[in-house]
From Swiss-Prot:
InterPro entries listed in its UniProt record: Metallo-B-lactamas (IPR001279), RibonucZ/Hydroxyglut_hydro (IPR036866), UPF0173 (IPR022877), UPF0173_UPF0282_UlaG_hydrolase (IPR050114)
Family as reported in the entry's similarity comment: Belongs to the UPF0173 family.
Protein name (database record): UPF0173 metal-dependent hydrolase RALTA_A1748
PANTHER family: UPF0173 METAL-DEPENDENT HYDROLASE MJ1163, UPF0173 METAL-DEPENDENT HYDROLASE MJ1163-RELATED
GO molecular function: hydrolase activity
Lineage of source species: Bacteria, Pseudomonadati, Pseudomonadota, Betaproteobacteria, Burkholderiales
UniProt organism field: Cupriavidus taiwanensis (strain DSM 17343 / BCRC 17206 / CCUG 44338 / CIP 107171 / LMG 19424 / R1) (Ralstonia taiwanensis (strain LMG 19424))
The entry's keywords: Hydrolase
Signal peptide: none
């Protein structure tokens, strides 16, 4: 009886419409300069990402490149990245911190981290203090001034140990690496990208999505140390609800076995987000 009444009410009010069709996903294209007024997102395997903003600023996130099995050979030499204006690091694990010290030396770009990693980078002599820019988790910075991209550090459900070999002793050491974070990057044209770094599923993804309204999420799907395909689908479909999603952090080790196909299947055919699956080294313009 209650079901029949609800069906009648839906018919009268039009309140039970079918889900909106998925957003049309941009097609990956060959690397090059982004079109005027657009942003270019270039995924390079695992979490390594280069974003070229509509204003021409180049932001590199989690640059694990030279030993990354998924990075195209052409990008395993750091000069291939070209101009770099800013380096963002989500946390201290080697597959994210990666080549940050070498890239900072090569480009003289500032290194930003919103989770406390910067102090360790300086104290261990990995990055000069003059190049390290610290800001708090949930804080917002505008590195290029008020008309440039705006970057906010948000929560990630993960860990952040910094492991390295001490050159003085030759011994492996583990140091505190701050807290893991993700980044909401609002570009000059208002387009918002959430690079989630490494994270498990957490309920406040809904709140972050409601506050910042990201157009695009770069979301880990590999499983083992991050969300797998099922959890990532819940995050995108039920909590964040972005326009587009690019799966990252998968198939770089036997443990991170999730696939884009599993992610898309878990998301379902009626999900509102368009899923984009570029190959490492393919750019997507927005």
């Amino acid at each position: 009886m209650r079901l029949a009444a609800l069906t009648t009410l839906c018919a009268l009010l039009g309140a039970c419409a079918a889900p909106a069709p998925p957003a049309a996903a941009p097609r990956p294209v060959a690397p090059g300069q982004p079109a005027a007024g657009k942003a270019e997102v270039l995924w390079l395997g695992q979490a390594a990402t280069r974003i070229t903003t509509p204003g021409g600023k180049v932001i590199v996130i989690d640059p694990w490149l030279t030993s990354n099995p998924k990075t195209p050979p052409g990008f395993r030499q750091l000069p291939a990245l070209g101009k770099v204006d800013l380096i963002l690091v989500t946390h201290a694990h080697n597959d994210h911190l990666g080549d940050t010290p070498a890239l900072a030396r090569l480009t003289n770009a500032p290194v930003y981290n919103g989770g406390g990693l910067g102090r360790a980078l300086v104290s261990l002599g990995l990055v000069p203090e003059a190049q390290v820019q610290r800001f708090g988790k949930s804080g917002t910075v505008m590195p290029f001034g008020p008309s440039g991209p705006k970057i906010t550090a948000v929560h990630a459900e993960h860990s952040s140990e910094l492991s390295l070999k001490n050159p003085a002793t030759g011994k492996d050491e583990t140091h505190f690496g701050g807290e893991p974070v993700g980044y909401i990057i609002e570009l000059e044209n208002g387009f918002r990208i959430w690079h989630m770094g490494d994270t498990g599923l957490f309920g406040d993804m809904r709140m972050i999505g409601e506050i910042y309204k990201p157009d695009l999420v770069l979301i880990p799907i590999g499983g083992y140390s991050t969300m797998g395909p099922q959890e990532a689908a819940i995050a995108v479909r039920d909590l964040i609800r972005p326009r587009f999603a690019i799966p990252i952090h998968y198939q770089t080790s036997p443990q991170a076995s999730g696939t884009p196909e599993e992610f898309k299947a878990a998301l379902g055919a009626n999900a509102a987000a368009g899923v984009i699956v570029p190959q490492p080294g393919e750019k997507v313009d927005f």
